[in-house]
Amino acid sequence: MALPAGPAEAACALCQRAPREPVRADCGHRFCRACVVRFWAEEDGPFPCPECADDCWQRAVEPGRPPLSRRLLALEEAAAAPARDGPASEAALQLLCRADAGPLCAACRMAAGPEPPEWEPRWRKALRGKENKGSVEIMRKDLNDARDLHGQAESAAAVWKGHVMDRRKKALTDYKKLRAFFVEEEEHFLQEAEKEEGLPEDELADPTERFRSLLQAVSELEKKHRNLGLSMLLQ
C-alpha cells in the first residue's frame, strides 16, 4: 500500500534536507542512509526509529518506494480496519495493548488523552526488561557476597569461641592449683606454730630472736606464694 509523497516525507528527519539514498521507517519517517548510519554508529542494537523510537523499521528497496514487510502490511491492514477505541491512523502502528493483545495506533492514543497504564511502547518495554535483568544480576551478586561474608563471620566466631573456652578452662585449673597450694601452706604453717608453742620455756629465753625468725619465715612464705602466682599467670 503506497503512501502519497508530500513535503514532510521529502525531507530527512535528521538533516532536514532531501534524503540521499532514502531509508523509510515503518512509522513513516524518512532519513538519509548516511544519517542513519552515523546516528547508530556506536550502537549494537536494537535500532529504533531516531525520530519516534519505534523499534521496527525497514530500508526502502527503491528511492521513493515505502518498504512493504510482512509486519508493516499486517499493521497497515489493522490500521485500515474499524478501530474499537478511536479512528485508525494511516501510519504504521507504534503501540500494542498488553491487556487485549490488539494493536493501537499513535492517533488513537493521542485521541484517548493521557497514556493509560496498560499501554506501553515496545522499545520502552524492551529497555525496561534489560534494566530489570541487570538489577536482578546485581542483587544476586550482592546476595552471594553477603552469604560469603556471613559464612566467614560464623567461622571466625567459632574459632574465637574455642579460644575463649580453652582460656577459661586453663584459668579454672590454675585457680584450683593455687587454692590447693595455699591450703597446704596454711596447714604447714599451723603445724609449725603448734610445734613452737610446745617447746620448753628455757628455749624461748630470747623472744626478740624468736620474733625475728617468725617474721623471716612469714616473709619467705609470702615470697613463695607471690612467685607461684606469677608463674601460673605467665603460663
Curated annotation (Swiss-Prot):
A single Gene Ontology MF term assigned here is: ubiquitin-protein transferase activity
InterPro entries membership: TRIM/RBCC, Znf_RING, Znf_RING/FYVE/PHD, Znf_RING_CS
Keyword Cytoplasm present in the record's keywords: the answer is yes
Specify the residue ranges making up the RING-type zinc fingers.
12-53
Record-listed cross-link Glycyl lysine isopeptide (Lys-Gly) (interchain with G-Cter in ubiquitin), residues: 195, 223-224
**Where does the protein end up?**
Cytoplasm; Nucleus
Function statement = E3 ubiquitin-protein ligase that acts as a coactivator of JUN-mediated gene activation in response to growth factor signaling via the MAP3K1 pathway, independently from MAPK8.
Its recorded name reads: E3 ubiquitin-protein ligase RNF187
Provenance organism: Homo sapiens (Human)
